[in-house]
Amino acid sequence: MANPVVSPESLLSEYADGPARLEAALTGLSDSELDLSLGENAWSIRQIVHHIADGDDLWKTCIKAALGNSDGLFTLQWYWDRPQMEWAEGWSYASRSVESSLTLLDANRHHIVELLEHDPGTLEKSIRLQPPHGTEVRITVREVLEMQVRHMTGHTQDIQAIRQAHGV
């Protein structure tokens, strides 16, 4: 099912508001409650926060590449070569404070929105993308922003589900 087309202003607003929505989902949680999850093999709230921030940081590079070099080829093959759980373990998602990740997420989103607001045509700029499996495609800045908004929304819902399951 295709996403309804939203105005550039609405998309940028939703993208910019992501960190505040994530912070709202975390409001009132103690440090130990950040370690709650839906099960033994499920990510904790803490791990989800780090995952969101790191994913956003990775895709920020795609946006900047599209703005500066539409003939370039963007790939995250180095990242896609390993399962996400290996990155989570290697980057200590389970034990690190979430503060630096929340700060990074907010700064990255603010930086990208500021870049995009200075040129009305930026959302349609694109770059070649080599996905992990399959053929090269062209991806627009709009598509990356939409993907990041969906990613944030999905994981914010995951956090709400964890909170509900544990009554916090």
Role assignments for model-derived ranges:
Residues 1-17:
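Extreme N-terminal tail/first-helix region
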Residues 14, 18, 84-125:
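Acidic/histidine-rich alpha-helical segments that form the ligand environment
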